[in-house]
Curated annotation (Swiss-Prot):
SMART domains: PX. Residues 223-278 form a coiled coil. It is found in: Early endosome membrane; Late endosome membrane; Cytoplasm; Lysosome. It is a peripheral membrane protein. The keyword Hydrolase does not apply. GO terms for biological process: early endosome to late endosome transport; endosome to lysosome transport; protein targeting to lysosome. The lineage of its organism: Eukaryota, Metazoa, Chordata, Craniata, Vertebrata. This is Sorting nexin-16. It comes from Mus musculus (Mouse). A 1,2-diacyl-sn-glycero-3-phospho-(1D-myo-inositol-3-phosphate) binds at R144, T146, R184. PROSITE patterns: PX (PS50195).
Length: 344
């Protein structure tokens, strides 16, 4: 009697499991949420066979450990000027377990930089999102409104108590109107702010895949990333050129001011040198503000010694030295002159 044929599940090799793991772990810029949803359906189908699931889990852990040991090329937009640099380093331990990441290590609020209407095959709109994991590390991802909607549906299933405000869909109207797209961009920005405001939601797998927190995209992963990379370089170059022109104008202005000050100093030195070489020259007291020049002749400060001697003898007053009188009068005249110059 022939025995009936019963199929026996066989374990899948390490190469196949690693290939599946690599395909599911790396999500592209477009449709990353849809890709992860497809992989979740495949996992539900695999859960029907108990022994096969255990074998696959063990193989995936082995392949994940070998994959995390390899270097990872990351793109960094550093500083306020968004300059670009690259670093090759192995994945960190917390990337293997996203649920173990500290709340302090969560990314800052993603910023939607703008939108663009694509018309290559089918017309659609993509939103350019700037994600900052740390002040030194940031990257750009591109998402459609459909990606936001799918993420919102997933979060409703995972967190029934939370209700995130997502801009509604628009029916029977033009979805590519500029005013409508700007309003939708503001609504999506508020949606992202609510995502990172809650600890559990910000660290869940769906959000991490949506923002590519575990595997940031490189500048050459797709055409969109390459174009964003070039646009960032162009914008940085433009700002640097403007700053350079402003600095050059400031330098020219300072050079002109320095030349004027140097001419003024040279004129003062020439005048001082002239006065020191001519001891009998007149004394000048000038004011630069009003342009007034006061001149005192040496003859004004001289006193006729003979006249003073005769007057003192006629009045029978005590005799005093005419030189002392001249010095006193000269001191009085100079003091009065200095006081008047300060008043003017």
């Amino acid at each position: 009697m022939a025995t009936p044929y019963v199929p026996v599940p066989m374990p899948i090799g390490n190469s196949a499991s690693s290939f599946t793991n690599n395909r599911n772990q790396r999500s592209s810029s477009f449709g990353s949420v849809s890709t992860s949803s497809t992989s979740s359906k495949g996992q539900l189908e695999d859960s029907a066979v108990g022994s096969l699931k255990q074998t696959n889990v063990q193989d995936q852990m082995d392949s994940a450990s070998s994959m995390c040991g390899s270097p990872l090329i990351r793109t960094k937009f550093t500083g306020t000027d968004s300059s670009i640099e690259y670093s090759a380093r192995p994945r960190e331990a917390e990337e293997q377990h996203p649920e173990a990441v500290n709340w302090e290590d969560r990314p800052s609020t993603p910023t939607i930089l703008g939108y663009e209407v694509m018309e290559e095959r089918a017309k659609f709109t993509v939103y350019k999102i700037l994600v900052k994991k740390s002040p030194e590390e940031s990257w750009v991802v591109f998402r459609r409104y459909t990606d936001f909607s799918r993420l919102n549906d997933k979060l409703k299933e995972m967190f029934p108590g939370f209700r995130l405000a997502l801009p509604p869909k628009r029916w029977f109207k033009d979805n590519y109107n500029a005013e409508f797209l700007e309003d939708r961009q503001l609504g999506l920005q508020a949606f992202l702010q609510n995502l990172v405001a809650h600890k559990d939601i910000a660290n869940c797998l769906a959000v991490r895949e949506f923002l590519c927190l575990d595997d940031p995209p490189g500048p050459f992963d797709s055409l969109e990333e390459s174009r964003a990379f070039c646009e960032t370089l162009e914008e940085t170059n433009y700002h640097l050129q403007r700053e350079l022109l402003e600095k050059q104008k400031e330098v020219e202005s300072l050079k002109k001011l320095l030349g004027e000050k140097q001419l003024h100093i040279d004129a003062l030195e020439t005048r001082i040198r002239t006065l020191s070489l001519e001891p009998g020259a007149s004394l000048y007291v000038s004011r630069a503000e009003g342009g007034q020049i006061l001149r005192v002749e040496p003859s004004v400060l001289q006193v006729n010694r003979d006249v003073l001697d005769e007057e003192s003898r006629a009045d029978h007053k005590p005799h005093f030295n005419s030189r002392e009188a001249g010095s006193v009068i000269a001191g009085i005249e100079v003091a009065q002159l200095a006081y008047n110059a300060e008043d003017d």
